[in-house]
Amino acid sequence: MKARTPKPGRPARLSRERIVETALNCDLRTVTMRDIAERLGVSHSALYRWVGNRDELLDLVGEVVVERILPTAEPTADTWRPWLTDLAWRMHDQFLAVPGYAAHVALPHRHNAQAFGRLRNRVVSAFKLAGASDDLAEQSWYIFGQGVVQWLGARQMGHDLGPDAPRFDLFLGVLLRGLPAREPGS
């Protein structure tokens, strides 16, 4: 997504980075553009010169979070499971570090196609390296993504997962032992 540039005039007090950093410290479930402008000490109309609306703001936040969670190394046929484990723990740490982010991502909505597309492509690639067909790699991505995001979202929203709810490490271990998805009976 191309960042907007401010109109000519006074030197900018805003930047994409300042806006995103401010948003990363707000509860993303409830934050408004007016809240962000107030925290930045600018008018909300000045903020709109940089970010068109709340959805665009959340897209920018998604780009930063996905950049933070993607491991620098690519998965291989020998490392796909540890790679996915590392990715899931990065998701755990980053999604829960941003107030309301895991809860936001867990709700049905339009995700940032570019950022989440990069995440999806890397995870699908890992499952293909594990021997999954194209279709089963896509199915495995869905199971992995939904499983991790829903667990994190429920935790962040304060839903009681019950007294016997598994710790994230146990949940992740069981999830990854069942992936990549396989055709029934195979």
Q: What are the roles of these predicted feature ranges?
A:
Residues 34, 43-46:
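Key DNA-contact positions within bacterial/archaeal DNA-binding proteins
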Residues 63-69:
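Short, basic, alpha-helical segments at the C-terminal edge of helix-turn-helix-like DNA-binding modules
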Residues 27-28, 41, 48-58:
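HTH DNA-binding helix-turn interface
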Residues 86, 106-143, 149, 153, ...:
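Amphipathic alpha-helical packing segments from all-alpha helical-bundle domains
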Residues 1-2, 157-186:
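C-terminal peripheral helix-coil segments that are non-catalytic and often amphipathic
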Residues 51, 61-62, 141:
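DNA major-groove recognition helix of helix-turn-helix
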Residues 71-101, 106-109, 144:
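Hydrophobic alpha-helical connector segments
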Residues 2, 7-35, 39:
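Short, amphipathic alpha-helix enriched in basic
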